[in-house]
A protein has these predicted regions:
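Glycine-rich, charge-decorated loop segments at or immediately adjacent to ligand/cofactor-binding or catalytic sites
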Residues: 349-371
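Hydrophobic beta-strand scaffold residues
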Residues: 280, 346-347
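Proline-aspartate-enriched helix->loop->beta-strand connector
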Residues: 311-316
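Charged helix-capping and loop-helix junction motifs
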Residues: 330-335
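Long, compositionally biased intrinsically disordered regions
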Residues: 342, 348, 369-435
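Small-residue-enriched flexible segments
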Residues: 193-290, 403-434
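A general structural motif
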Residues: 291-307
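Long, compositionally biased, glycine/small-hydrophobic-enriched stretches that function as flexible linkers
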Residues: 1-227, 416, 427-435
Length: 435
């Protein structure tokens, strides 16, 4: 009998990681991962584009700071099934979301780099920093994971576009290489994800995810292709868990991350409640940052139309970068408006744009239909100053904002927003009072 490529039953074998060390072979044993640094370098090297690639380890609680952070990735590999993890970047592009993955729980691959050519305007990378300990650590994504850090330096004459493409390949290959150390092992725990039939009287819920897409350095990839021109698309939640979405957005420290897509807390919570108090129907993704008001309204109606055709009664929404960059917010609000007008009750999780004291408008755009908004605070909220650190990975200097001069990366540091702070706060469940 032919394999059913559309089964969408995904098993995830989780191997917990408490410690990583460099050794003569790559091997997992009892929560510890030994890494052959030379073998890992050989697996991901692209000397024509990346002239120098350094690999470091960073553990929670260390007096360590990571600078020039571009993205974070979950180490996982497909050990059974015909598709691949992170489909589209290598391997087949047949639908992901089934088979068995092995995941290194509590670990991440982090890529740090600066681009070779000068940039300006909106399509520019913005400094992102992670402190592994101290007062800022709770508000830094991946400060609580054991991290393999790739520090990449471009070869002479390489363009920003070619360097960026190589960084994507390097981080994803590293993630797969590390997880494959467990391929022949039996996982301590196995999590199974499938949208099994449930009580038809439960509320029918769809998750609507607005992706960020502007151009190079501010984009999201779906099955290996950027989402410029993407029409609203239906995904099985397992496709997200399998790495169908990959981050290429470096515009803000609060940016989305590939790790956040594969560990999407909205998807995980809806799965947890599937069959208990909700009937989780699936995920609708669409592109934010449409080019005109007409296209923003069109996008909203197309997203709502797809949710309605699924039979959704409720939509739960979120957006990359929190959804409140001025342009993105309009797209976000138009989707809420369209869903509500199509009879779909809509709850949206988003960041605020105002100051903590309430002196600025909370959001830059608003529609009356948006009557169930959940705030995870704003960009400049909950950004405690950090003391000096003993070790820095990624560079000798840091530039907290474009208005400031570079400074010693190991010294005391104040930033507008730590890496991944918005989705970290949402993950922590901070309330408006807390934030």
């Amino acid at each position: 009998m032919a394999h059913d490529a559309g089964a969408f039953q995904l098993e995830v074998g989780v191997f917990p990681i408490q410690r990583m060390t460099f050794a003569s072979e790559t091997r997992y044993q009892s929560g510890s991962l030994s890494i052959d640094r030379a073998a890992l370098l050989a697996a991901i090297a692209e000397p024509r584009v990346i002239a120098d690639l350094e690999i470091y380890l960073a553990h929670p609680g260390e007096s360590c700071r990571l600078v020039h952070v571009l993205d974070t990735v979950a180490p996982m590999a497909k050990v059974q099934g015909r598709s691949t993890v992170y489909p589209g970047f290598f391997g087949t592009t047949m639908p992901a979301g089934d088979g068995r993955n092995h995941l290194l729980g509590g670990a991440a691959v982090i890529v740090c780099a600066t681009f070779p050519d000068p940039t300006s305007g909106a399509l520019s990378p913005v400094e992102a920093t992670i402190d592994m300990s101290g007062p800022a650590a709770p508000y830094c994504a991946c400060s609580d994971t054991v991290n393999v850090v790739l520090v990449c330096h471009p070869a002479p004459g390489v363009s920003n576009a070619d360097f960026d493409a190589a960084l994507h390949r390097a981080k994803l290959k590293a993630a797969v290489y590390l997880a494959r150390a467990t391929a022949a092992l039996t996982p301590p725990t196995v999590e199974t994800y499938e949208l099994s039939p449930v009580d038809p009287d439960l509320p029918r819920v769809v998750y609507v995810d607005q992706l960020h897409q502007q151009g190079l350095m501010a984009q999201t990839f779906l099955y290996g292709k950027h989402t410029q021109g993407l029409e609203p698309t239906l995904l099985h939640p397992n496709e997200m868990l399998d790495g169908a979405l990959v981050n290429g957005n470096y515009r803000a420290p609060a940016r989305a991350a590939t790790y956040g897509h594969t560990h999407n807390f909205m998807v995980q919570e809806l799965y947890r409640r599937h069959g208990q108090d909700v009937n989780f129907l699936g995920v609708v993704v669409g592109r934010g940052w449409q080019d005109s008001q007409v296209l923003k309204e069109r996008q909203g109606w197309m997203m709502a139309r797809m949710a309605r055709l699924l039979g959704a009664q409720v939509a739960v929404m979120s957006a990359d970068v929190g959804g409140t960059g001025g342009n993105n917010t309009i797209d976000f609000m138009q989707t809420i408006k369209a869903c509500e007008q199509m009879g779909i009750q809509t709850v949206a999780v988003m960041q605020e744009s105002g100051n903590p004291d309430g002196s600025d408008p909370t959001v830059v755009d608003f529609v009356p239909e948006a009557n169930a908004l959940i705030s995870v605070g704003g960009i400049g909220w909950h950004t405690p100053a950090a003391p000096p650190v003993q070790r820095v990975i990624g560079g000798a200097t840091v530039q907290p904002s474009i208005a400031e001069e570079p400074r010693d990366a190991s010294g005391p540091l104040e930033v507008e927003c730590w890496y991944g702070a918005i989705w970290k706060r949402a993950e922590l469940g901070l309330s408006a009072v807390d934030a």
